[in-house]
Amino acid sequence: MHRIVSPSGATISYDRSGRGPALVLVHGAFSDHHTNWEFVRPIFENQFTVYAIARRGRGETDATVAHSLKDEASDVAALIESIGERVFLLGHSYGAHAALAATAKIPHRVRKLVLYEPAWPTILSKRIAARMESLALAGDWESFAITFFHDGLFVPLKDLAELRASNLWAPIVADAPASFRDLRALARHDFRPEHFRGLTVPVMLQIGTESPRHLYATDALAAALPDAWIVSLPGQAHEGMTTAPQMYAESVSRFLLEDVALAA
């Protein structure tokens, strides 16, 4: 892995692969720089030089404890600054918040931005948050993950059972301690869509047609951002890059490269 040092002093690691214009990927919670993009990264590598950042507690990145979402936005911005060219930026879930905040810090370095379902900081009710806190402190990471997916994201029991039986589940549970810190940082995050009214970078806001729309800030951001529109992913929920990778990658590439195609 490659490494940089963030303004906070934390060591941040990332993978680089592929060839083409720079595309920075910022993963969400309950995943890392590998698992979040496992099925779409090989597709992206045919069109882009892919920089997959490992957020705090993943890969060889420092596992800090009391960091904020703004700290992680600074990590993303530091990676972008190190690349030496303007980049395309894609963030998923928690990673979408970090990507958006990073873009606001250095808008001149971001060509276009893709945000897939950034959750409201209040996504978890006080009751569910308290239960997850107790499970985390007890080290019961499997129950912690189950509670998040079923009671937080409202994943149906049948779908959750299928997820737990798949080879995707073990990495999800393994990431739970880092995700616990993510959820704490998100809950403290002062997120107000209207703060981004002056951000003129073109933004595509992705949302799955099967996702509980009220959990995500997609519509509020579409109303606040001056150059943004929503693209729905038919039949998908929160993990479209895993459940429909070809469709997902085509949606992203079409948006990012449309001006390049017109210029050609």
Give the ranges of each region predicted by the language model.
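Short beta-to-alpha linker loops that shape the active-site pocket of alpha/beta-hydrolase fold enzymes
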Residues: 54-59, 119, 234-236
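Hydrophobic, aromatic-rich cap/lid helix
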Residues: 167-192, 210
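Short beta-strand/loop motif that positions the catalytic acidic residue
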Residues: 199, 205-207
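Conserved alpha/beta-hydrolase "acid-adjacent" motif
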Residues: 212-217
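Catalytic histidine-centered segment of alpha/beta-hydrolase-like enzymes
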Residues: 233-247
